Regions:
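Active-site substrate-recognition segment that forms the wall
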Residues: 23, 28-33, 144-145, 149-233
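Dinucleotide-binding Rossmann-like beta1-alpha1 core, especially the glycine-rich loop
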Residues: 1-76, 85, 202-204
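Generic structural signal for well-ordered, non-membrane alpha-helical segments
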Residues: 10, 14-17, 46, 50, ...
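Helical element adjacent to the flavin cofactor pocket in flavoenzyme catalytic cores
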Residues: 88-149, 157
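Short strand-connecting beta-turns/loops that link adjacent beta-strands
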Residues: 45, 127-133, 187, 210
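General beta-strand structural signal in soluble alpha/beta enzymes
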Residues: 66-69, 116-118, 152, 215
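Alpha-helical scaffold segments in soluble metabolic enzymes
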Residues: 52, 104, 108, 160, ...
Length: 233
């Protein structure tokens, strides 16, 4: 919640979602570790960026953010880089297994009456009514679906859905990332981030709920529709 620009929807849902994950984990039965995290800085320029992230987080409602020095960095995570001179310490950070969360959310949705339509991509959207009182008809190979509210959670297809619905026009940039999974190394207990850039949060070292460590991820730009697996970048 400290990275998104204040006032955006992402800023609002990041902070609130992080707050709720402990409750969701208990209610839905997935693993969740709240370890805290650090964004590491190595010079005065990085420190200025960390201070901006701290201010963002304060406005966005992220609790207990602070800038710490090298002694505190290595007290919190002894395996952090010895060259790190500053860090943004965020004690509320946690991590999950995203596959477990997706399955748990799906099961909970089914238990609450949600119907899933498989192999039913949206091919067209008809919009009727005014902007404030719209009605949507979604055409799919499995039949039409009518609704009053339409949530665009289509991932790489989000721009197409938005266009068909007559909503915001935007362009998707496809990226493919490689993740290194370490199955024999001792666990790094908290996520360690570099200072983010305008296009990426960089390569992150983090523990997992299963006890191992992952290094994630590259962000190679790919052509739209490219879903093939690449061995390396």
């Amino acid at each position: 919640g400290y990275d998104p620009a204040p006032g955006t929807v992402k800023a609002q849902v990041n902070a609130r979602g992080c707050e709720l994950y402990g409750t969701w984990a208990q209610e839905l039965g997935f693993l969740f570790c709240r370890t805290g995290s650090m964004v590491l800085g190595f010079n005065d320029e990085d420190r200025a960026h960390l201070e901006q992230l701290r201010r963002n987080g304060y406005v966005n409602g992220v609790p207990e953010l602070s800038i710490v020095g090298p002694d505190r960095i290595h007290e919190l995570e002894p395996r952090a880089s010895a060259d790190a001179t500053y860090a943004l310490w965020c004690p509320s950070t946690g991590f999950v297994d995203p596959f477990e969360v997706a399955i748990a959310a799906l099961e909970n949705a089914v238990a609450n009456g949600v119907t899933f339509m498989r192999s039913a991509p949206v091919e067209a959207i008809e919009v009727a009514g005014s902007v404030d009182d719209a009605r949507f008809t979604l055409a799919t190979p499995a039949g039409n679906v009518r609704c009053r509210y339409l949530i665009n959670a289509a991932g790489n297809g989000a721009a197409d859905i938005s266009h068909m619905a007559g909503a915001e026009e935007f362009q998707m940039v496809w990226r493919q990332g490689n993740i290194v999974v370490l199955d024999k190394e001792p666990r790094t207990l908290m996520p360690l981030y570099p200072v983010p850039t305008p296009v990426s949060k960089g390569v992150i070292v983090t523990g997992t709920v299963h006890g191992n460590t992952v290094i994630t991820a590259t962000a190679a730009v790919r052509e739209p529709g490219d879903t093939q697996t690449y061995a390396s970048d």
